[in-house]
UniProtKB/Swiss-Prot annotation:
Biological process terms in GO annotation: DNA replication, removal of RNA primer; mismatch repair
Protein encoded by which gene: rnhB
Similarity comment: family membership: Belongs to the RNase HII family.
Keyword terms, alphabetized: Cytoplasm, Endonuclease, Hydrolase, Manganese, Metal-binding, Nuclease
Coiled coil start-end: none
PROSITE patterns recorded: RNASE_H_2
InterPro entries, A to Z: RNase_HII (IPR022898), RNase_HII/HIII (IPR001352), RNase_HII/HIII_dom (IPR024567), RNaseH-like_sf (IPR012337), RNaseH_sf (IPR036397)
Main location: cytoplasm
Documented EC number(s): 3.1.26.4
Residues binding a divalent metal cation: D20, E21, D112
Entry protein name: Ribonuclease HII
Gene Ontology terms, MF aspect: manganese ion binding; RNA binding; RNA-DNA hybrid ribonuclease activity
Domain RNase H type-2: 14-197
């Protein structure tokens, strides 16, 4: 899973950042963006993207990534910002902001197929989290952070099973919306299955 990084290092790049997001599709909660920079000669220890891992495996790798990464940067995009810009624009804007706010001076960003502003030196990769261990690491960080946020929201909104469906468009979630109405963390620009006048 490090062929992309190996190729870029052979071309003379010294510092590569991987960036990814979690929470593009849910009806509620934030979009979480994470970027990760590993030392140049870090041996890959992630062999699949976050979707192919159990929650326990993600939690383990979350800690391991923190142990080995040179820098990790996390951006939380609230549902109000998603409603304001639209999910695709919000992802693009806040990914760019995340990369610009990194403390390290990096050479190129690997992105899981999001085209960023041309002023940012980046390489959009189809299924990037499956072929780049740096993107895969960012994917795991974003997913774990978002899941933890949604578990906390379960305490705040006990009528919603945010600890289980994490805000995604499940049958259970739609039933909860129908019964209890929408919460302040629901994305009003998404189809919530209710008329909100």
């Amino acid at each position: 899973m490090d062929n992309v990084e190996k190729e870029l290092f052979s071309q003379g790049y010294e510092k590569i950042v991987g960036i990814d997001e979690a929470g593009r599709g849910p009806l509620a909660g934030p979009l979480v963006i994470a970027s990760v920079i590993f030392p140049k000669h870090q041996k890959p220890f992630i062999h699949t993207d976050s979707k192919g891992l159990s929650e326990k495996e993600r939690e383990y790798l979350f800690e391991k990534i923190h142990d080995y990464a040179e820098e990790i940067n996390i951006t939380i995009v609230e549902n109000t910002e998603i409603d304001k810009f639209g999910i695709s624009n919000a992802a693009k804007i806040y990914m760019e902001n995340n990369l610009k706010s990194l403390k390290s001076k990096w050479d190129i960003a690997l992105v899981d197929f999001v085209k960023l502003d041309e002023s940012i030196n980046h390489l959009p990769l189809i299924k990037g989290d499956e072929i780049s261990h740096t993107i895969a690491a960012a994917s795991i960080i974003a997913k774990v952070v978002r899941d933890r946020i949604m578990i906390e929201y379960k305490e705040k909104y006990p009528n919603f099973s945010f600890d289980k469906h994490k805000g995604y468009a499940t049958k259970q979630h739609y039933q909860e919306i129908k019964k209890f109405g929408i919460t302040p963390i629901h994305r009003r620009s998404f189809n919530l299955g209710v008329n909100d006048d």
